[in-house]
Amino acid sequence: MRVALTYNEKRTASASPDDADAEFDSREAIAAIARLIAELGHPITPIDVSGPIPRLVDELARLTPDVVLNLAEGERGTFREAFYPALIEQLGLVHTGSSASALAVCLDKALAKRVVAGAGVRVPRGRLIRATDDPRLARSAMARVPLPAIVKPNFEGSSKGITAASIARDRAGLADVVADAIARYPHGVLVEELVDGIDVGVGWFAGIGLLPPIGYRYDGEIYDYALKHLTPERVQLEIPPPLSVAVARRLAVTATRAFVALGITGYGRVDLRITPQGDAVFLEMNPLPSLTLAAGHDELYVAAARLGHAPRGVLAAVIDAALPRGQPRQLCA
């Protein structure tokens, strides 16, 4: 089975404070994934999608892959993560992971929260603020958000735009934080109550099921960009974290509801906070979580290993889940 591996190559240093390509993959990370796919017996061709789109279309036409292992995050626009899956779908090829429509919904954090809230999942109280909003209405909306509050970009992932300075404890400070965030992310920022609790991620792979929850322990109030990308050694992973049976069961139910409500297929990871009272609060859905094997960023593989699945088997599950969804090798001109 011929596999094309689409991705965006990271151009900056892995520990760069610039978050422009924080979601992209290094050559080393892609090479490690490609080696495992080759060990499964599949000829694989990595393709850096950065650059002219016609070049990518021509390359896919030449390869006629049976499946596209898509890790591309996209570079521009509020729905960039959905672009390459949409293109692949329009070319008549199959790709791993969720559909373009599911990716588009999940990248809009405010919309994703409305969807899961409709499925009975608790979400933080908050408001979406855009650069084009009427200032008076924006101030009124922010005034209804409980303090302390956190301000985060609505259309970003990988904790981009989230720092210790994203937390506001009074109304004047909140206005300043929002103004700074809007200047950088004019498409919109989420202003939300800062939910007290511990950060937990729950991964899921078709053919494997829910993974043991991943607990993130660190000094500070939030799992921000610096902790995730600059100093990951300061984060302690607990797989699983120490949760009571009742809380663990509640977490699994909440995670499952979120995956189903958002139409996640193939694989994904939902991020939540467990409150001191044991409630699971939805933070965001990552329908395209990192599959890197690099230490400190390989928590999905570590969680899968708790169930007896090696990285090669995890990647096999990702590919196998994509195969029923369409007809391979029907590339449209």
List PLM regions with ranges.
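Short phosphate-binding/catalytic loops that engage adenosine nucleotides
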Residues: H42, L93, V121, P186, ...
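Phosphate-binding site of ATP-dependent enzymes
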Residues: D170-V253, I274-V281
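ATP-dependent carboxylate activation and anion-phosphoryl transfer catalytic cores
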Residues: A117-G120, S244-A333
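ATP-binding N-terminal substructure of ATP-dependent carboxylate-amine bond-forming enzymes
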Residues: M1-T96, A100-S101, V105-L107, L111, ...
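Active-site nucleotide/adenylate-binding loops and adjacent lid/helix of ATP-dependent enzymes
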Residues: M1-T6, L60-T64, A104-L190, D196, ...
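Short acidic, glycine/proline-rich loop/turn micro-motifs
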Residues: S14-D19, K160-T163, H297-D298
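A short acidic/small-residue loop/turn micro-motif
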Residues: A131, R217-D219, L288-S290
